From Swiss-Prot:
This is Ribosome-binding factor A. InterPro entries: KH_dom-like_a/b, RbfA, RbfA_dom_sf, Ribosome-bd_factorA_CS. GO terms for biological process: maturation of SSU-rRNA. It comes from Proteus mirabilis (strain HI4320). Its main location: cytoplasm. Keywords: Cytoplasm, Ribosome biogenesis. Belongs to the RbfA family.
């Protein structure tokens, strides 16, 4: 019977859970704020992992948000060794992957798209209401 998921996919899912727990409970850097792990891409040999994070305390597209993201990513990449050591204790792997953190803007982009759609719907309702009068 064939497996539906490769080992790398299973490891990346487990890493996502464990890193989220580590960020929530162990990392105390205020620059990180409310970071969530949205995904993990891992190399086939399990040597490198790219961790995608989002920051929940951002508003839609402000200048200060970009600075907060840069500071948060810098703090996460500086703490990558510490997070990797805790990850090694939490997971049973022969080699714990080297971690790099990247910002996942899909949440902010989704909020922006949702706002655009709701604005178009409001405008359409206003036009329809004016035509009825």
């Amino acid at each position: 019977m064939a497996r539906d998921f490769s080992r790398a996919q299973r490891v990346s899912q487990e890493m996502q859970k464990e890193i989220a727990i580590i960020l929530q409970r162990e990392v105390k850097d205020p620059r990180i704020g409310m970071a969530t792990v949205s995904g993990v891409e891992i190399s086939r040999d399990l040597a490198y992992a790219k961790v995608f994070v989002t920051f929940l305390n951002l508003s839609a597209g402000e200048e200060s948000d970009e600075e907060m993201v840069e500071n948060g990513l810098k703090a996460l990449n500086e703490a990558a060794g510490f997070i990797r050591s805790l990850l090694g204790k939490a997971m049973r792997l022969r080699v714990v992957p080297e971690l790099t953190f990247a910002y996942d803007n899909s949440l902010v982009e989704g909020m922006r798209m949702s706002n655009l759609v709701s604005n178009v719907v409001k405008d359409d309702e206003k036009r329809r209401h004016k035509e009825e009068e």
